[in-house]
């Protein structure tokens, strides 16, 4: 009969702290791994954020302007959405069109939308 995960969890749950410590050490020796916590960088301070150049941008449709139909067409082309979804985005401005894009792509999207008559922000 094979041991199930539930059996292992039940056995580990009944161990004392000292027994768990010994178990962790045995895992480290047997498999050549370390149970040390991985250091995670905290949030950068305001000064560090300014010094580091932003690499990902969000393109936000601020308003559709007078040429809504043209803006809807461009939004559909950029996002690949259907007509109704693109219209809902344009009607619900301000809305994010694309997230996490490169600066060049964000500027290209901004140019396309502005040529169609929209007002666009890059964040």
From Swiss-Prot:
SUPFAM superfamilies: ClpS-like, Ribosomal protein L7/12, oligomerisation (N-terminal) domain. GO terms for molecular function: mRNA binding; structural constituent of ribosome. It comes from the Bacteria. Pfam families: Ribosomal_L12 (PF00542), Ribosomal_L12_N (PF16320). Keywords: Ribonucleoprotein, Ribosomal protein. The keyword Ribonucleoprotein applies. Forms part of the ribosomal stalk which helps the ribosome interact with GTP-bound translation factors. Is thus essential for accurate translation. Homodimer. Part of the ribosomal stalk of the 50S ribosomal subunit. Forms a multimeric L10(L12)X complex, where L10 forms an elongated spine to which 2 to 4 L12 dimers bind in a sequential fashion. Binds GTP-bound translation factors. Gene3D superfamilies: 3.30.1390.10, Single helix bin (1.20.5.710). This is Large ribosomal subunit protein bL12. One of its GO terms (biological process) is translation. Belongs to the bacterial ribosomal protein bL12 family. PANTHER family: 39S RIBOSOMAL PROTEIN L12, LARGE RIBOSOMAL SUBUNIT PROTEIN BL12M. It comes from Neisseria meningitidis serogroup B / serotype 15 (strain H44/76).
């Amino acid at each position: 009969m094979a041991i199930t995960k539930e059996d292992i969890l039940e056995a580990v749950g009944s161990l004392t702290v000292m027994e768990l410590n010994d178990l962790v050490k045995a895992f480290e020796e047997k498999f050549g791994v370390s149970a040390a916590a991985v250091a995670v960088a905290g949030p950068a301070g305001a000064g560090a954020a300014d010094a580091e150049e932003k690499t990902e941008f969000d393109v936000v449709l601020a308003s559709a302007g007078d040429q809504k139909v043209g803006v809807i067409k461009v939004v559909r082309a950029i996002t690949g959405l259907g007509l109704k979804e693109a219209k809902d985005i344009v009607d619900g401005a301000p809305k994010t069109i694309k997230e996490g894009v490169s600066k060049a792509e964000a500027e290209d999207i901004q140019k396309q939308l502005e040529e169609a008559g929209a007002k666009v922000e890059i964040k």
